[in-house]
């Protein structure tokens, strides 16, 4: 399809013939999907990884009618089960994954180190697909409404307090918040859920989870419905949709952690397959449909991380920042 559109630019028949002769070697080796593609996601239904990929892949399928993506949810081990499957998959373009940054590239190395088969740099990177600020939300019955109130609460509570979290980045936000706030970790605990939707649903319920941490993109429907209260967001900027809510700042420090999703292929994927995914997925991020979808759902694109090199550089910075804290909180020793 791509080459046909390219040839239509030439009106002279002889030029078309010459260009076609030059393109024959490329046509002979260019890869395109001819059967369904399995998309591994290591979360329960409703994660940002899943909903974001569904939106982007709809654009890709519109431009490539033969591309058929079958999402396979494989939760467990904070996405390790899904990524072990990707690691073992044939590098033929028919198995891909959409994992989260923090789990895959930082915390799996510490908290799931005995479960994983892969190194953080084992996979073939296409690039980042989107990011969303994380947020701290509270059950509507909680007396806490602001970040300063929450800081005081985790310092001085005299009864058990439980946070719900749905991923590695969410757990890291909890740990950093408690570390900077000098919170009482004997009484303030975090309970891990298999996905962010499950974590925010638990926070909204009467199950005893007073607070929750998850992407604001996933919490938004329950925030807007009044089922949970938005306390604060990660990063240094306000979220336009919630102008009255301040970024989380603890003892002068912002929490620079985001929910972030990437497109990865198995180790050793050939360059022609990499080229197809790059050519189709990265431009789709700037399509009018995705631009509007991301705006509506509080997701943004870090364009520096939409190339393999830029993405790899971003991951190294992420590891340099957050590996030390994850090593302080070794779940295998708790």
Residue ranges and their predicted role:
Residues 15-20:
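Sec-dependent signal peptide recognition
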Residues 31-121, 167-170, 180-213, 222, ...:
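N-terminal (or domain-start) structured segment
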Residues 33, 85-95, 109-198, 248, ...:
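Hinge/capping helix and adjacent helix->loop/strand transition within the periplasmic-binding protein
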Residues 34-36, 185, 272-334:
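An extracytoplasmic/periplasmic, membrane-proximal ligand-sensing/linker region
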Residues 45-46, 78, 102-105, 133, ...:
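Solvent-exposed loop/turn segments at secondary-structure junctions
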Residues 118-129, 164, 187-192, 210, ...:
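Short beta-strand->loop
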């Amino acid at each position: 399809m791509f080459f046909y559109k390219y040839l239509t630019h030439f009106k002279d028949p002889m030029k078309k013939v010459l260009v076609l002769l030059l393109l024959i070697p490329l046509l002979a080796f260019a890869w395109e999907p001819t059967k369904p593609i399995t998309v591994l996601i290591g979360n329960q239904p409703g994660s940002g990884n899943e909903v974001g990929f569904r939106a982007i892949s709809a654009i890709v399928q519109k431009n490539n009618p033969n591309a058929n993506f079958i999402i396979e949810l494989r939760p467990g081990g904070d996405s390790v089960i899904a990524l072990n499957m990707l690691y073992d998959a044939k590098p033929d373009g028919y198995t891909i994954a959409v994992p989260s940054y923090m789990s895959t590239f930082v915390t799996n190395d510490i908290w799931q180190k005995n479960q994983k088969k892969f190194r953080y740099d084992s996979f073939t990177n296409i690039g980042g697909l989107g990011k969303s600020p994380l947020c701290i939300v509270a059950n509507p019955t909680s007396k806490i409404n602001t970040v300063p109130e929450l800081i005081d609460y985790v310092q001085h509570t005299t009864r058990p307090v439980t946070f719900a979290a749905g991923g590695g980045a969410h757990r890291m936000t909890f740990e950093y918040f408690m570390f900077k706030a000098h919170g009482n970790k004997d009484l303030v605990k975090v309970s891990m859920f298999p996905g962010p939707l499950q974590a925010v649903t638990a926070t909204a319920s009467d199950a005893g989870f007073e607070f929750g941490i998850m992407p604001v993109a996933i919490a938004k429907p329950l925030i807007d419905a009044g089922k949970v209260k938005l306390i604060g967001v990660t990063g240094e900027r306000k979220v336009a949709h919630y102008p009255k809510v301040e970024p989380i700042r603890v003892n002068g420090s912002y929490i620079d952690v985001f929910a972030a999703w990437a497109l990865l292929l198995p180790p050793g994927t050939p360059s022609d397959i990499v080229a197809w995914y790059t050519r189709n997925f990265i431009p789709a991020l700037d399509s009018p449909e995705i631009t509007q979808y991301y705006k509506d759902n509080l997701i943004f694109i870090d364009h520096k991380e939409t190339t393999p090199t830029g993405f790899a550089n971003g991951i190294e910075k992420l590891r340099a920042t957050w590996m030390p804290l994850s090593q302080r909180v070794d779940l295998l020793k708790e």
